[in-house]
């Protein structure tokens, strides 16, 4: 057996699709899969995908997004890893490890958030540094949504009996955080907007959001769901952006607050509150959010969100590990925002 490592452009598209269908466990038509992969890999901007091939067959993959981060006040490119997977019958040959070691030799520091049990077992053994864990927040608005989330959490899938659970509202009224000023305003972000985004609050580690990322989300294929992009203003000043995703599932609508980009800490609670109310007005029966920022976590808790098991985060190399705090790590990281179901 001879395993070759090739780039995305040098591999068979049909073989990649077959491998990723097994990785994601999704049941999509060929047309939908082609559209999704063109957006996911072709339109995202900087990134690199390594594929392990046994002859013409794709047997392993490791993908990465490359985007700017603010690290202790300096802007630096960071490589976010995702889609680390190889066919079970090839794991004994170290195919996945070989892909990761190849990626670890690149010049950018690397970030990994969450992942499979296999991933979380291997990264510490590869001497990655563990960052502070990321809180996992959940707010179930209806009884059916709560049943769906529990069955998915415990069994890995949403069971058919969930649809028989009545759509009883568990939360009748949610508090609304007052705006920071009388002239505060929330607007929908238009895909035609090309203005440069303001710098974010001074975190020790946070992604540097730009218009290209917002454009990428705004042009996502319909099968991914719908991304809600909101802009926040105070006295005409652009003070933040929120990115959320709405998915229509069999049991109802699930939403996820993917990321908040705020220019200062004091507007975060208002932005979280307005984003949540927007998602509820759009029909969300449950809202999820990952957050490591203490201000964001406090705002979510005050609105009734419940903390679930935290999500591990890792950094390579140890010698460049960010220190201090706070960190602002959310679902705006590689493919974490694009989980299905």
Identify the residue ranges that each predicted region occupies:
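Residue-level signal for alpha-helix termini/capping positions
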Residues: 42, 104, 219-222, 280
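Amphipathic coiled-coil/heptad-repeat helices and related helical stalk/stem segments
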Residues: 33, 96, 210, 271-272
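Short amphipathic alpha-helix that is part of the acyltransferase structural core
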Residues: 1-53, 58, 74-76, 80, ...
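Oxyanion-binding "anion nests"
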Residues: 206-232
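Short, hydrophobic/aromatic alpha-helical segments in well-folded domains
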Residues: 98-99, 213, 217, 274-275
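Conserved donor-binding loop and adjoining core beta-sheet/short helix segment
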Residues: 10, 17-113, 133-135, 234-266
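Active-site/acyl-donor-binding loops of N-acyltransferases
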Residues: 110-173, 220-221, 228, 234, ...
């Amino acid at each position: 057996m001879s395993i070759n490592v090739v780039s995305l452009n040098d591999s068979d598209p049909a073989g990649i699709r077959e491998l990723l269908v097994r990785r994601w466990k999704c049941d999509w038509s060929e047309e939908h899969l082609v559209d999704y992969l063109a957006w996911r890999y072709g339109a995202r901007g900087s990134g690199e995908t390594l594929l392990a091939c046994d002859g013409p067959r794709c047997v392993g993959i490791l993908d990465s997004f490359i985007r700017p981060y603010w690290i202790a006040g300096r802007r630096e490119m960071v490589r976010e890893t995702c889609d680390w997977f190889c066919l079970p019958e090839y794991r004994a040959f170290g195919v996945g490890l070989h892909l990761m070691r190849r990626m670890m030799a690149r010049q950018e520091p690397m970030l990994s958030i969450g992942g499979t049990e296999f991933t979380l077992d291997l990264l510490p053994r590869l001497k990655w540094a563990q960052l502070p864990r990321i809180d996992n927040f959940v707010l179930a608005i209806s009884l059916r949504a709560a049943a769906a989330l529990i069955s998915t959490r415990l069994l890995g899938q949403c069971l058919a009996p969930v649809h028989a659970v009545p759509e009883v509202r568990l939360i009748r009224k949610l508090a609304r955080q007052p705006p920071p000023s009388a002239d505060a305003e929330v607007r929908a972000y238009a895909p035609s907007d090309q203005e440069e985004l303001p710098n974010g609050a001074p975190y020790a580690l946070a992604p540097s959001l730009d218009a290209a990322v917002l454009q990428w989300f705004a042009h996502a294929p319909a099968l991914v769901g719908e991304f809600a992009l909101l802009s926040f203003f105070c006295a005409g000043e652009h003070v933040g952006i929120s990115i959320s995703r709405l998915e229509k599932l069999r049991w109802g609508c699930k939403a996820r607050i993917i990321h908040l980009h705020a220019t200062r800490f004091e507007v975060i609670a208002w932005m979280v509150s307005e984003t949540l109310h927007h998602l509820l007005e759009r029909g969300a029966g449950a809202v999820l959010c990952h957050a490591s920022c203490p201000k964001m976590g406090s705002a979510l808790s005050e609105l009734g969100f419940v903390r679930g098991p935290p999500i591990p985060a890792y950094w390579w190399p140890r010698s460049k590990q960010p220190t201090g705090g706070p960190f602002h790590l959310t679902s705006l990281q590689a493919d974490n925002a694009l989980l299905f179901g």
